[in-house]
Amino acid sequence: MTTACISACARSGRVAPVSQRVSTPSLEVHKIVAGVWRHVSYQHLKKWGWFPSNGLIVETSAGPLLVDTAWTTEQTRELLRWVQRRWNRLPVGVVVTHAHDDRLGGLQVTGSVGITTYMTKAVADQAHKQNKSVPRLHIISTPVVQVRDVEVFYPGGGHTANNVVVWVRRARVIFGGCLVKSAASRGLGNIADATLETWSASISKVARRYPTARYGVPGHGSPADLALLDHTRALLTSWCSRHRSRCGH
């Protein structure tokens, strides 16, 4: 995989370890496979310090498509500048995978330049309940739908009740978002809006629907293969064994 860092880290040719960063880290763009990139943005969290969040840039027949914005407005502006330099145009749309800031924190930026937002009604409703603006909204009305050249699939609740995953068939890349944990994860992370009783079943639906996936991209952390799904289920099993009432047992 190749990596591009915007602004200062592009000039230095390297990325400082997260623990050494003082100012907000620059956006990073990592090539996964031909036509698919992972964008990585950061937010400072009290418990973990500077914490990375993943989204995708997918080259489609209509032009570049974003899966989730960057975490902040400024990093989303950086993301749009990267796309503009690469394709000499703005993205044709942004698919939002759930209604947390690490997925839609830059929607005001994308909306201000006319980029269409694709999300399910459930995600849109949740965003509105949180008083988040959703500009240029196009509602995804079915559990499985094609958006440009990608498939958006709602497998059931997990990290949130309304999280979706995105399948890039030609590249065999599945973007699991925060439904899927990275191999380095040792816990479930933020479960404030989780539906713990259905999460494992939702992971199983993703595994059955996309058995040929070569790359799995979690919401946070490094991509891997479909072993990420097994790892997520194992984390759920461990957590639920200690909190049985929270998991519907």
Residue ranges of model-derived segments:
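Divalent metal-coordination and catalytic microenvironments
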Residues: 35, 58, 68, 83, ...
